[in-house]
Regions:
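Bacterial N-terminal signal peptides
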Residues: 10-20
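Hinge/cleft segment of the Venus flytrap/periplasmic-binding protein
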Residues: 28, 157, 161, 176-177, ...
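Extracytoplasmic "Venus flytrap"
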Residues: 30-53, 57, 62-79, 83-85, ...
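Short, solvent-exposed amphipathic alpha-helices that sit
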Residues: 42-57, 137-141, 164-183, 197, ...
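Hydrophobic alpha-helical segments within soluble ligand-binding/sensing domains
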Residues: 73, 129-154, 168, 197-199, ...
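Hydrophobic alpha-helical
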Residues: 90-107, 173, 187, 191-253
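Flexible loop/turn connectors
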Residues: 236-238, 242-302
Length: 335
């Protein structure tokens, strides 16, 4: 009887140890908040890839959507902090909302890493910033046209003007295009990132300039509209098109030979890299307050099979976890 009691006590102690260790392990699991600006596909693909990567790294992740509302974004940041998250990965809505997010995170002692929206005042208060080099992103597209079109008229279909990104893309593209003095930009129209407006813009451009030989379209959603317009008019074979983003439908256009080149800035691999950097900051392995260029990739038919896809598989994301992290760089001049 005494032996049975000893055995029972031993089992109870063992169970308590297991429960204690289990609780300790659970407490040690890091939790990250991913706050996206909207629920649009770009941000959905980014958060999906980050969630898959987090799971493979043994990290818990909670996803918030701010719906382009600064007040909602701040509420998301505050809710994440109240949950006791270890870090925040965020696509901010605006500069003012970034400031509010940084203030709240700093007050709570929670590292916060921004994807886009760099501002020099906020860099030392953050875990880091990551975004693309806007001018540098578009420049190789102009260079490709300069090398692959001997001469002729070029058109540019821009995104929404006034925010600075569309203007920077145009500037970078023109720098690359300038390598061939026989190419002349004869039309530059804003289609506000909208497929239908791009369709209408391309129709008007080709009507006014039926001998156009090249078009730079600043994102692939607009490129779909441009391709549809040129197909309807029977001019698609005449016009070489370059674009940006690397979205699934953009890669489809490349596969079909309707888009010659795109420069991709996949939200998937960018979010995975940003997550890894943030985790490094949290663990004390990476110094906070640095700026990083987001991963980009020029994609044509020749390398389509190795493109960093927005809708990457779990196997692809697992391979990204083995890649070297982006190195910190000197931040771009503030606008």
């Amino acid at each position: 009887m005494r032996k049975r009691n000893v055995w029972s006590v031993g089992v109870m102690v063992l169970c308590m140890v297991v429960l204690f260790l289990g609780g300790a392990f659970a407490e040690d699991q890091l939790e990250i908040a991913f706050i996206r600006a909207t629920g649009e596909p770009y941000y959905q693909y980014g958060s999906r890839a980050a969630e898959i990567a987090a799971k493979k790294l043994g990290v818990k992740m909670i996803v918030y959507t701010s719906n382009l509302d600064p007040a909602q974004e701040l509420a998301n940041v505050q809710d994440a902090i109240s949950r006791g998250v270890d870090g925040i990965l965020i696509y901010a809505v605006s500069l003012s909302s970034e400031r509010a997010a940084v203030d709240a995170a700093n007050k709570a002692g929670v590292p916060i890493f921004f994807q886009y929206g760099y501002h020099p005042d906020l860099l030392p208060k953050s875990a880091g910033f990551m975004q693309i080099d806007l001018k540098g992103f578009a420049r190789p597209l102009g260079e490709w046209m300069a090398e692959n079109i001997p001469s002729g008229k070029i058109a540019i279909i821009e995104g929404t003007l006034g925010r600075g990104d569309a203007e920077a893309y145009t500037e970078g593209f023109l720098e690359g295009l300038a390598k061939n003095p026989n190419l002349q930009v004869v039309a530059k129209v804003s289609a506000e990132w909208n497929r239908q407006k791009a369709y209408e813009a391309a129709t008007n451009i080709i009507t006014a300039h039926p001998d156009i030989v090249g078009m730079f379209v600043q994102n692939e959603d607009m490129a779909v509209g441009v391709v549809n317009a040129l197909e309807r008019i029977g001019k698609l074979e005449q016009v070489k098109i370059v674009s940006q983003n690397g979205a699934p439908y953009g890669l489809d256009l490349i596969r079909e030979g309707k888009l010659q080149l795109t420069n991709a800035n996949p939200p998937s691999i960018a979010s995975v890299m940003a997550l890894r950097i943030l985790l490094g900051v949290i663990k004390g392995e990476i110094e906070p307050g640095h700026f990083y260029w987001a991963p980009t990739q020029l994609i044509s038919k020749e390398n389509l099979n190795v493109a960093y896809r927005w809708d990457a598989s779990e196997e692809e994301i697992e391979e990204w976890l083995k890649l070297p992290l982006p190195e910190p760089v000197i931040p771009p001049p503030s606008s």
